[in-house]
Design a protein with these regions (language model features):
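Sec-dependent N-terminal signal peptides
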Residues: 3-13
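N-terminal export/assembly leaders
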Residues: 18-98
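Alpha/beta-hydrolase-fold serine-hydrolase catalytic core, especially in secreted/extracellular enzymes
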Residues: 58, 65-68, 84-178, 190, ...
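Flexible loop/turn segments at secondary-structure boundaries
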Residues: 177, 202-205, 233-236, 285-288, ...
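Cap/lid segment of the alpha/beta-hydrolase catalytic domain
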Residues: 190-266, 307-317
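Loop/turn elements at helix/coil->beta-strand transitions in domains of secreted/extracellular proteins
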Residues: 191-194, 221-224, 272-275, 296-300, ...
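Primarily recognizes the serine-hydrolase "nucleophile elbow" in alpha/beta-hydrolase
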Residues: 261-328
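The feature captures the conserved acid-bearing segment of alpha/beta-hydrolase catalytic domains
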Residues: 300, 312-367
Length: 434
């Protein structure tokens, strides 16, 4: 028996040795390679990829003793994976994400884009190309052409609160498909600004407290705000349980444009066409940027905790259609720059992918606005000690922006006056068939 064990041990040793030579492609198990890297660079490596049974050829030759980042690059590329620095000498390996890149990649992208235009004329030529290809890749016009033209909406009773009113709307868009929204209006009659407010992937969607606070407060100050469900969220989930689709990408953009059309047509006496905006956070910020690039009626926009040159949006509803391949390649900051020289606010923080905005994306935007001599029209409020949310300071930045550019009534700014309604009150489903 001892002799058998000895033979098996020798065979295993020979086999391992055979792997660690030229004919064996210097192959090593991935799990062992990662342990070696941890030890050599004094780091911790977390894995979201399955390492079981995976082997890395020329493993030791992929290690760059002077750079943990280049080493991880060389390892990850073989397995179609990527790495992310999580701070405190910790790195995470994840499967490749087409919409997410490193900050350094974003910097290279903006440099490449900036070289394409050095004045207003070159920039506007680029805009025309972007606008055309963006619509084609999103397929938005095919969807809009298929929409019902004279569908009669279902409207709830108007609910009256302190300085503002709320009414729900259900609008059939495509045959058998519905858009669900709530309209927050100033109690005072007159011409008002209109703000389309797509929401992101925050818990409870458009029914959450901070969304109601923001829209109601803006309404109290003099803006009509329209909040609508993401495709496959809220009421829409009853019809479309699968939110993470590329179809959601175009439907959500279509819904925003249809709401703008409906409001302008049916409440024309209340809408000041010189004051049309979009404002949303996270995925709602991505949608805000997209809406502004699709429709020139927007006169101001404010994407919150969303904008980055190295992240297109982590959900297919933000990046499922290949819009970022438009015009040879683009990114959300360039799409947002199509608003120039109109007023734009970018709200960013230090706790998510927007941490790079003050040093990277904002200078790029300032350069574009500079082509028009309007650098002051693009603004960045950066909150380095905050995280990914739509908290009070972020809402305050939005209030200040619209008070300035839309001349809202600052004396009405008081979130304590807002009544937080249950989700059921903001839904139209009771009026639709089960």
């Amino acid at each position: 028996m001892k002799k058998i064990f000895t033979i098996l041990f020798c065979v295993a040793s020979i086999s391992a040795s055979a792997q660690n030579n030229y004919s064996g492609r210097y192959e090593r198990p991935l799990s062992d390679v990662l342990k070696s890297i941890e030890k050599q660079f004094h780091v911790k490596i977390k894995c979201d990829i399955d390492t079981a049974g995976k082997k890395l050829p020329y493993a030791d030759f992929r290690i760059r003793p002077y750079s943990i980042e280049e080493t991880l690059d060389n390892v990850c590329k073989y397995f179609d994976a990527n790495w992310w620095d999580q701070g405190k000498n910790t790195y995470k390996l994840k499967v490749y994400e087409y919409a997410r890149r490193h900050t350094s990649d974003g910097e290279k992208m903006l440099c490449w884009l900036s070289a394409k235009y050095n004045n207003k004329e070159e920039w506007e030529e680029r805009c025309n190309l972007l606008r055309k290809e963006l619509r084609e890749r999103l397929e938005i016009d095919a969807y809009l052409d298929s929409c019902l033209k004279n569908a009669k909406p279902q409207l709830s009773k108007v609910r009256k609160f302190d300085g503002y009113n709320v009414q729900n709307i259900c609008l059939e868009t495509l045959p058998g498909e519905y858009l669900y929204a709530s309209i927050y209006s100033p109690a005072k009659k007159g011409k008002h600004a209109l703000i389309i407010c797509p929401n992101g992937h925050f818990y409870e969607g458009r029914y959450r407290k901070d969304q109601q606070q923001r829209l109601a407060t803006l309404a109290r100050m003099g803006a009509i705000c329209v909040s609508y469900d993401l495709y496959g969220w809220g009421e829409s989930k009853r019809e479309h349980p699968n939110h993470r689709t590329d179809r959601a990408h175009v439907i959500q953009a279509m819904d925003g444009l249809l709401l703008l059309d409906w409001m302008v047509k049916n409440r024309a006496k209340e809408i000041d066409m010189e004051r049309i905006a979009a404002n949303g956070g996270s995925g709602g910020g991505s949608l805000t940027v997209l809406l502004s690039a699709l429709d020139e009626r927007f006169t101001a926009v404010a994407p919150v905790v969303s904008l980055a040159s190295h992240f297109d949006g982590g959900c297919p509803c933000e990046s499922g259609k290949p819009i970022h391949l438009s015009a040879g390649g683009t990114c959300n900051p360039e799409l947002l720059a199509m608003m120039a020289p109109k007023p734009v606010l970018v709200v960013s923080d230090g706790g998510d992918w927007t941490a790079s905005v003050p040093q990277l994306e904002f200078p790029y935007l300032q350069r574009i606005w500079g082509f028009y001599g309007s650098e002051s029209n693009v603004r960045n409020v950066h909150l380095p000690n905050e995280r990914h949310d739509f908290g009070k300071n972020k809402r305050q930045a939005v209030y200040n922006f619209f008070i300035d550019v839309f001349h809202l009534d600052a004396s009405k700014l008081d979130e304590e006056k807002v009544t937080i309604e249950p989700a059921s009150s903001l839904q139209t489903i009771p009026m639709t068939k089960e």
